[in-house]
Amino acid sequence: MMENYKHTTVLLDEAVNGLNIRPDGIYIDGTFGRGGHSRLILSQLGEQGRLLAIDRDPQAIAAAAAIDDPRFSIIHGPFSALGDYVRERELQGKIDGILLDLGVSSPQLDDPERGFSFMRDGPLDMRMDPTRGQSAAEWLRNAEEADIAWVLKTFGEERFAKRIARAIVERNRELPMTRTKELAEVVAAATPVKDKFKHPATRTFQAVRIWVNSELEEIEQALKGAVEVLAPGGRLSVISFHSLEDRLVKRFMREQSRGPQVPAGLPMTEAQLQKLGGRELRALGKLMPGEAEVAENPRARSSVLRVAERTGA
C-alpha cells in the first residue's frame, strides 16, 4: 500500500546544500523516509563517495530497496544510535555530513493503518516502528491519569490536559479505545473551548506520538552522536517541524557552539583550559521555507532548517 502515498520532501535543496557535499565524502541520512534527501545526496557524490541511511520504519526500509547503488547502504534502526552504527564501521571522525529530518513523514500521516492522524480512521498505533514497543492504544489503556495529563501538557502544550486525560481514562474504563476516530471524539468532547483553525485533537495526537516514540530523547541522542562522529569541518543539517523539536535543536547547537563556560577572572593555565575542551560546533544559521514551497506543500509551513559545522582538528 505504501506506494500510494506521495511524499514531498521539505527544504530538500536547502538541507542538502547545508551539508556542503564533497564528491568523495561520507554522509549519513539519519531519516531516510522515502529517500528524497538520499537521492539528492547520491546525485552529488562521486564514485568514491558513500551514503549511510537510517530509518526505524520498516516501510522506509522497503522503499530503500529501490536504490540500487553500491555507494548506498541503509540500517533498520533508530537514528539515536547513529554514533554506534558509525563506530561499528570504524568511521568515527570521518563523517563529512549528517542530515536529520525530524518528526513524522507524510506517508506515515497519510496511511490510516499507521494511526498517526485523526483525519481518517485507523488503528490507534502511532509507532514509527510497529514491530517494537507499546502502541498508543496500549499506553493510553495502561497509563495513570496523571501521567497522561503530564504527557499532553509537556509534549502537546495542551491547556486542557487534565480534562482530556480524565476523559480518556473514563472512556477506556468503559470500553478500551482501539481506533484513532475514538480518541479524536473523546478529546473533542472534553475540550470546552474549540480553536476554529485547529482540530481539538491536534495537540493530543502530537503529544501521544512523541511519547510513544520517545521522539525528543531520540533527537537528543542523535545530536550527541552526530557531534562525536563528524569530521572537523563536517556539517550537521537538521529540519524540525514543531517548536519542541526546534527549541531542542537550537539549544543543543547554541550550547555546543559556546564551549565550556568559565567564570571571568578564574585563575587557570592554558593547559587547564584545553582540558575543558573547546566549542564543538559552529552554528551557521537557520532557514525557513519560502512562500512558494508552503503553497505547494502546506505541511512545510512550520519547518525550520538549522545547520552547524564541526570545529576542531
Curated annotation (Swiss-Prot):
Residue runs in coiled coils: none
InterPro entries on file: RsmH, SAM-dep_MeTrfase_MraW_recog, SAM-dependent_MTases_sf
Keyword Cytoplasm: yes
Reactions accelerated catalytically: cytidine(1402) in 16S rRNA + S-adenosyl-L-methionine = N(4)-methylcytidine(1402) in 16S rRNA + S-adenosyl-L-homocysteine + H(+)
Top EC class of this enzyme: transferase
Spans traversing the lipid bilayer: none
Functional description taken from the UniProt entry: Specifically methylates the N4 position of cytidine in position 1402 (C1402) of 16S rRNA.
Name of the protein in its database record: Ribosomal RNA small subunit methyltransferase H
Encoding gene per record: rsmH
